[in-house]
Regions:
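Accessory carbohydrate-recognition regions in carbohydrate-active enzymes
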Residues: 1-176
Length: 176
């Protein structure tokens, strides 16, 4: 018996990384990111993952143990005309974001259930997640983009990075 349930809705909210997933005591050290084509770093709108969603179909995804890909079509909501590809590594992931000539080419980071603060420097970023319980430690995240963002904005525990290119790769590593 497992608590896992195949997603029944057509809403895709984000990719979530968990330091230690558990159906018994809950995830600890979670951190989320999402491709976005509706917001730019200059926006004054709320851009937290709780306010964003992308329409998707399981017909537009490839899900394997070593590779995940989902494409959002022109009706894809906040991620219209974009795609995420993810390959896990031993302590991180390599992610590619593809944008189909949209005006806004952004990635949004959020730590919805804990403390976090993202710092950008050139094409790198570092952040942490304080979403912990049972005395667990903070999870640290370090990432590197294939290009320097054209602009970033940080707001409490969420941030946005916007790009010029139609394809951006992000390498990230995390640990306690």
């Amino acid at each position: 018996n497992s608590a896992y349930e195949y997603q029944k809705t057509d809403e895709f909210r984000c990719m979530r990384i968990s330091h230690e997933p558990s159906i018994w005591v809950g995830d600890r050290g979670t951190w989320q990111f999402m491709v976005n084509t509706s917001k730019d770093y200059n926006t004054n709108d709320d851009y937290g993952l709780g306010t964003l969603k992308a329409n998707f179909s399981h017909d537009n995804e490839v899900a394997k143990a070593h590779y995940y890909k989902v494409s959002f079509d022109g009706n894809g909501g906040d991620a219209a005309n974009s795609q995420i590809e993810l390959t896990p590594t031993s302590h991180g992931a390599v992610v590619r974001f593809t944008y189909n000539n949209t005006a806004n080419k952004s990635v949004i980071f959020d730590c919805a259930n804990g403390g976090s603060r993202t710092e950008y420097s050139g094409n790198t970023f570092k952040t942490y997640s304080d979403h912990t319980g049972n005395g667990s430690k903070r999870m640290y995240i370090y990432g590197e983009f294939s290009e320097t963002p054209k602009g970033t904005k940080i707001n409490d525990r969420k941030s946005i990075a916007s790009f010029n290119s139609n394809r951006v790769t992000m390498k990230e590593e995390f640990g306690a």
